């Protein structure tokens, strides 16, 4: 039986199960096993069954572009300029939090620690600290912080009520027990301190729904519920400053749970959105397979080497027709996925006649409209 990590109550029938034996992770890698997703209608929270040995996975196997502190995920392209995710995260953080001299900030679930490194460069009077559940990134941390400013596995005892701000960038979707983690963060903050958190918005970036290693898919309602349960007053939940994500800011007001009443209209909207998302993914694999049959034997490519493109690859019965993946992220060019080369769009071979577009459906049409070359050479395009 699967238990809701936020309420402690049993979750009943799944709203989604992947059809094949392979699932996709948030790093666009494959995972042997099914993705099983549940929905708690009481608080509007989507929860995925944990992968096996999840603690070991994050300690030893979850390698978030850890070769260097420069590797990153492409966030968006504006007027031809590539903007990367961690760059955008720092700029958004600075627009939301007023960092004063000698403030102390901890990044909880920091991975490479790049956000705090960049924050320290822009705000050298702010003291930065790091915590993660792995030691894989220590070689990067020690390049810019002394050893008493970072910790792995457990936070330091001397950090009790030390921090003015605790941040968490795309970590709380991974943790099996977010209530436990946020209560621990409560003990690390000074009274009145702020928790600044970014998590995926599954209703804007629907690909988050099917990744095997994201245990939690929050809504506005379930974020407010989580904050209240850990003694935080919700200051803001912003759905627009970071595409496909919630920016949630809470203020520590108590060490105990707070009373919280979910708005019934907001909850009804979340229920409808969750059902629509589940229906979409429950039918998508059949759509991909039908398209594959209709273009069988033609040379094809998958546009997008991220979650959506990887999902397409796991659905195909035969990858022989796939010649390559196309992606705009220059950090991926020259690498491979599913034993296929990842190339820039400018190098698309003219013999490619079929393209599977592995992008967020909300932006896919707009992105592809900027590729006039496709109209000349490509005969069949699948949008998810």
Question: Where in this protein do the model-derived segments appear?
Answer:
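Conserved N-terminal segment of class I S-adenosyl-L-methionine
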Residues: 1-165, 169, 182, 246, ...
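Short catalytic micro-motifs in class I SAM-dependent methyltransferases
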Residues: 169-176
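A short helix->loop->beta-strand "cap" motif at the edges of active sites that frequently abuts
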Residues: 125-126, 193, 375-379
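Hydrophobic, well-ordered beta-alpha structural blocks that scaffold small-molecule cofactor pockets
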Residues: 251-384
């Amino acid at each position: 039986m699967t238990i809701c990590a936020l309420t402690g109550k049993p979750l009943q029938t799944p709203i989604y199960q992947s059809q094949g034996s392979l699932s996709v992770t948030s790093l666009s890698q494959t995972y042997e096993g099914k993705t099983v997703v549940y929905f708690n209608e009481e608080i509007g929270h989507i929860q995925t069954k944990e992968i096996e040995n999840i603690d070991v996975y994050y300690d030893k196997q979850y390698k978030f572009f850890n070769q260097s502190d420069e590797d990153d995920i492409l966030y968006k392209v504006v007027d031809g300029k590539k903007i990367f995710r961690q760059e955008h995260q720092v700029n958004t953080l600075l627009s939301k939090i007023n960092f004063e001299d000698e403030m102390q900030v901890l990044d909880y679930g920091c991975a490479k620690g790049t956000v705090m490194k960049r924050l320290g460069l822009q705000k050298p009077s702010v003291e930065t600290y790091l915590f993660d559940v792995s030691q894989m990134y220590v070689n990067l941390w020690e390049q810019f912080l002394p050893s008493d400013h970072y910790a792995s596995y457990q936070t330091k005892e001397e950090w009790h009520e030390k921090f003015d701000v605790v941040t968490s960038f795309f970590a709380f979707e991974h943790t099996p027990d977010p209530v436990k983690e946020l209560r621990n963060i409560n003990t690390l903050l000074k009274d009145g301190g702020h928790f600044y958190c970014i998590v995926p918005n599954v209703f804007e970036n629907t690909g988050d729904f099917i990744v095997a290693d994201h245990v939690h898919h929050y809504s506005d309602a379930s974020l407010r519920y989580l904050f209240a349960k850990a003694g935080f007053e919700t200051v803001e939940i912003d759905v627009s400053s970071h595409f496909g994500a919630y920016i949630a800011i809470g203020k520590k007001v108590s060490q105990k749970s707070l009373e919280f009443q979910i708005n019934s209209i907001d909850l009804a909207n979340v229920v409808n959105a969750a059902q629509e998302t589940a229906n979409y993914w429950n039918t998508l694999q059949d759509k991909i397979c039908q398209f594959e049959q209709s273009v069988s034997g033609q040379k094809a490519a998958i546009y997008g080497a991220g979650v959506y493109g990887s999902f397409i690859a796991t659905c195909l019965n035969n990858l022989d027709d796939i010649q390559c993946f196309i992606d705009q992220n220059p950090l991926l060019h020259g690498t491979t996925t599913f034993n296929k080369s990842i190339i820039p769009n400018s190098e698309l071979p003219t013999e490619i006649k079929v393209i599977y577009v592995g992008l967020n459906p909300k932006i896919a049409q707009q992105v592809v409209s900027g590729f006039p070359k496709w109209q000349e050479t490509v005969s069949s395009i699948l949008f998810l």
